[in-house]
Amino acid sequence: MKKNLTELVFILDRSGSMQGLEGDTIGGFNAMIEKQKKEPGEAFVSTVLFDDQTEVLHDRVKVSDVQPMTEKEYYVRGCTALLDAIGGAIHHIGNIHKYARNEDVPEHTLFVITTDGMENASRRYSARRVKEMIRRQKEKYGWEFLFLGANIDAVETAGHLGIAPDRAVNYHCDSEGTRLNYEVMGQAVSAVRCSAPLDEHWKDAIEEDFRKRQKSGRQ
């Protein structure tokens, strides 16, 4: 494996229910990437946008070469084909690693999945198949998967996909919640890139915000 090289895969919801949060999503993502450019080590970035279709915005682009996302790429529409986005990305990255020389395979692989609603439009992949794919990559190759969900039970949904409770978190799908998501996401990515242990506390800030606003009734 290639030391100090990380495979980063971002799977981002852009279905119709994300309307009104385009600017926050674009700004949060771009700020996170800019911070990653300053981190030590190398990284490849893949970004998959999904609604009822899947669009690959970045396909293993060196983090230093990633251009800012704009409203031309991130615009909301359609339904939520979450399983197709996850399954397609795992298949693609898995094949690249499978046929690469061992010394070229990244030391770390991290998938970050964000969605603000229930799966309702996938045609190619089932939950059972995606769960098996995730299990295999985690057990055999040590891949990490983080799941950030709004308007659903994120822990339960992630569990159906084989993602552990300590790797899933509920968030408020608004401007404040979206900004916090990308801030925390960036911290988790930095930890993985420098081989620091990613414990259950990676999501504390998001959980605190979610509980506080849920308790006060402020959405």
Model-flagged regions — what are they?
Residues 1-219:
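Acidic, low-complexity intrinsically disordered regions
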